[in-house]
Structure formats: C-alpha cells, structure tokens
Amino acid sequence: MAATMSEGGVDDFQSGYADTEHNVFEDYVNAAEGDASGKDQNIYARFLKDAHTRLYPGCKYSWLSFLVHLYHLKCLHGWSQESFTALMGLLSASLPPEANLPKTYYQAKKIISELGLDYVKIHACPKDCILFRGDFAKNDFCHVCQSSRWKVDEKASKGKRKEKRRPAKVLRYFPLIPRIQRLFSTTITSDDMRWHEEGRVRDGKLRHPADGEAWKDFDDRHDFANDARNVRLGLASDGFNPFGNKNLKHSTWPVMLVPYNLPPWICMKQTSLMLSMIIPGPNSPSNDVDVYLEPLIDELLELWKGVETFDASSEKKFPLRAALLWTINDFPALAYLYGWSTGGTYACPSCGPATKSFHLKKGNKMCYMGHRRWLPQHHQYRRQRKLFDGTVETGLAPETMSGTTVLGMLEGKEFVLGKKVPTTKQSNKDVEVESVKKRKRSSGEKKNQTKGSSGKEKKPEDWLKKRSIFFKLPYWEHNKLRHNLDVMHLEKNVCENFIGTLLDILGKTKDGLNARLDLVQLGDRENLHPIVDSEGKQSIPDAPFTMTRAQKEILCPVIQNLQTPDGYASNISRCVNMKDCTLNGLKSHDDHVLLQDILPVALRSCYPSKEVMKIVVQLANFFKMLCSKVVDLSELDKLQESIVMTLCDMERIFVPSFFTVSVHLMVHLVEEVKLGGPV
C-alpha cells in the first residue's frame, strides 16, 4: 500500500475490533456491498485491523501480511488457481481455527483486489502510433499505419486450430487518482502530505524541492498553493531489460511518479514511489512515448481541476488537485520526453540554438566547448587566444530555453507519432521510400551535422522532433524547470572520460592520433601535434594529462587494495586490470565514489601534472557540494564560478574530443539545483 502503517495508526479502530473470532471473507463482502459513501472507509478499517491481527497467537505474520505473501508467491512462481486453492485448503486444515484463512483462490483474490492495486490493460498499436482507447477502443486496425491490433496466429489461419485473438501490444496502466486519494485515507500520511508547508525549515538552505525557485514560482503563478494538501509530482522513466540477459535486446519502460509533498526522508522511499505504467518492449518507445502517456495526462488534467477526496486528518472531503512539476531522466530518455534531439550541433537542451559546438573531422564527433561565455565580461581568459581556440570570447552566457520559446519554435509544425511514419507532413511517396531502407550517411554527410538529407542547412527548430504531450497541461509552458538533467549519469560519463583518458583505455580514451590531427586542423597547441619520423610514421607527444606506465602502476594497486566500509561501494578491486593498468566494468555508483573520494587522494603520488590534479580536486568538490543533502543557497554562486573556471582550465589542457555533451552539461547543474532543490 502507498500509505505506510504503524502501531499508532490503528488506535481509533482497536476498541471496535476486540474480537478476533470473525469470518474475514464475509466481512469484506459486506463492506463492499455497503453504500458507496461508507464503502472505502469500511474496507480500509478492516484492512487496518487485519494488518495488526496475528494470524494465530505467537505467529510473526499478521493475517493480512500472510495472505499477501501467499498471493505474491503464487504470482512469482506461476501457481495455477487449482494448486492455490488446494494449498489454502491444506493451510486452513493445518493452522489453528482462529487463523480463519480464505478457503479458495476466489476468496483470496476478492480480498486482495480490495487493496486497490489494480491496473488497466490498454491495447496499443505494435508500431506505437495510437492506443486503442476512447474513439479507437473498438477498432481492429490502426488508422495511422493500418497495422492489426491483434497478433497473427499462423496455425489458426491455416485451420489447424481455433483462432484466439491476442493483442499485439499491451500497456499496463495503474490509475493515479485513487492512489493519490489513498495518501489522505490515514492520519499518518495525510499529515505528512502537508509537511512541505507546515513542517519545512526555512533558513535559506535547500533541503527539499519546496525550497527551490521553480516551486515558489509555480505557487506565485497559480492558486494551487492555497491548499497545502494539493500534490506536486515528479516523473521518472528509463528502459531496462527485465530478463537480466545481456545477450537479449529488450527494453521495458516503467514510468514512476514521486509525490514531493512528503518530507525528503520519506518521498524517495520505495513505499512512496508510484508505478504509473509499464510500457512494453521489446523496443524502446523513443519519441512515441507520448502515445503511452495519454492516460496519465488525462488524469493530470482532471486532477488540475480537482477531485473530491476524503481527508482523514480533518475528517472532511476536499477538492484534491495535483500537478506535474518536472521529469527526471538520463540524457537519451530526456530527448524522448522533451522532444529535443540530444545529438549534433544543438545537442544541449538548455542552451538550444545558442549551443556552441563544432564537428571534429578526424575524430568524426561533435565537440562542445566555448565555456568562456560564462566568465565575467572582463575576465582575462576571454582575451587569451593562444591558451584556447585562437579567438577572443565576447559572447555572453545563453539563457535556458523557456517553454514559451519552445512553443514558438514549434509553431506551424505538425508531427505524426509512430514507427515508420513521417515525423512531419510529407508526401506518401517520400514515406514509402524512407520506410523501405535505412540509408547510411556518406562521409560527406558526416562532415556537416547541420545539413539535412536534402542538403539544406538544418535550423535549430529542426532539433525538435515533436510537440511534447506535457504541453497539454495548462501550466507546463510556464514551469521554470521542466526536464531535469540526471546528475548520476552525467557524473558517470565525466568520470569515464577522465579514467579512460588518464589510463589510456582502448575504446574509452578521448586522446589518440585522430584527436591530435584535429588539433592540427584547428591550428591549436602545436606542442601536441603528431610527430612524423624519418620513415613517415606518426607518433603523438606526451600531453599534460598523459600518465606514464610507472604512474599507472602506482595508481592501480591503490584502487585494487582499497578497503571501504560495508555498503559504501561495490568491490571496485574486481574492475582493476593490473596487467594492462586499466579500469573496466564500473557501475554508476563506482564512478560516483571514484570521482568524489578516491581519485583526489589516489592521484596525489602519481598525478601526470599539477594542472590535471587541480582539475580532479575541483571536480570532486563540485560534485560533493552539488550532491549534498543540504545545500547552502549563498554558496551556489561560488560553485557556479568554480565549475566555469574548471571547464575553462580543461579547455586549456585537454584535447577537443574530450568535450562530449556530458562534460558541457556540468555548467547547467548549479542552475537546476537553484530551481529544483538538492540532488
């Protein structure tokens, strides 16, 4: 249940339920058949009582927890209904009479279903064009791509067996409104839902999203804040392989909702997270994720107007409202929900058209630099040509794109969702040609990432691949923070860049012959240009970030022999290859620990140069302060100045290929902390 129960939560019900000798199944049936106004209260009271009634004297399980555990085992191990009924009969005969368990599968299911944890199955087009709901609920074919709603049974089509229609794709959706209403069905969670207004400490420090500017701006714009019980939500989603087989490509997407009204030590607990839907695989929904979000958006629109809900604290009904503040995703998933392409010239969703990037011809990748724009106007780095890209920087830091700006860029554009259908209106002939074969880019096309397939220069608005479904929410356009950057994955990518480059790990290093040849084409840092010997062979000179074999042999044993407290990190020693002096197979938390705690210490006796050592220490301090549970608002401006200087120092030392979009995105993290609160 979404609401956690404790001993104090049932005091009001104890006196009325002193007698434990009762027919539980009949009580639930009678409660369910009662009048609509008292139905929920009667069932909930019964659940509270049975959650604290021992199955029999001396048993460690309560009556309800024992039944839920049994039903959970049935689902996990695929027990048939007959076997479950037989087991219930055996248990009823074996246990003391006061256990009074249901005798059949039907009776057990009847009780479990009253928990309200049901979901709705919604058929979907196999090409992610539409959901078969509303006006399309009775259709057998998708009106966009003409795909069948049903799987094709070859044996049935040949007459070998009777045809049984099975949906090609099914979305499992968990209704949101009853789950939010449940948070107010007990005084424990009902009081916690007002904590952000009544219990929050206001001392100028960031501890909770309510301390951030985005929350306060939302309150100023709307009358939503008039009632502290109104719910603020965050949405998180990402793909994963539920089968645990890395050789099998499968991506199932759960969508989670987080109620931010709760205190920070409660809202991120597993019991508080709400599973909104499960988007089926085997392929990622990509930009078509909006199709699957339709039921959630419909409920959010209803919740914005208000839904009558009973509050256990005041023992009165009130119009409950809810709003979605933002989403939290890794960078690829952010592109799917935002609709902004996170690759190519304008990959940064914050800078948008003001993204400063260029294509490295030899390395065949994009480079995102130009961080001197965030420096003060008269800073000396702005005028130093030789240390940077040979230019004087006069530009100013770009402003983050607002929702109004995005809608302006979408004006006049139309999109069609679904696989193998045009992203904008095109002729049927063009669609057929594109769907027949995916054409590979030629080398000429790769050279200029701003040119489309027609050879025309691509405009910044072409990076918008759709109009996000979130803009259907009347308040979304004006939300100051709509899509959060995932600090965990950004930190992992930055750490991998450092580890791969310092240890020269094959496939992960950002340095190499092509990276140095790009320096030649850019006319930058002649001391790092490749050296050609008498036989015509090219070699690359050592850079300030190049570690010698001896230095690597000092660093790797330190990491391999490191002993940490239990639960602090995984066994990082297994990732160390002493033969090649490399690190492989690091998880996100391993990179987090390495960058913040281990590298600043482990590199002290073997750093390649003082400049690199200084950068590592600065990055460690940056992420440590950024990821603190309590952030001092007065220190954030200094933190922003620090990361800008660090990025500029990195531009002086590292080759351009080092500057992937993840490295650039660090410059926006402080702003997001100001808006949304601590990480």
Regions found by a protein language model. Give the residues of each.
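Extended amphipathic alpha-helical scaffold segments
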Residues: 596-606
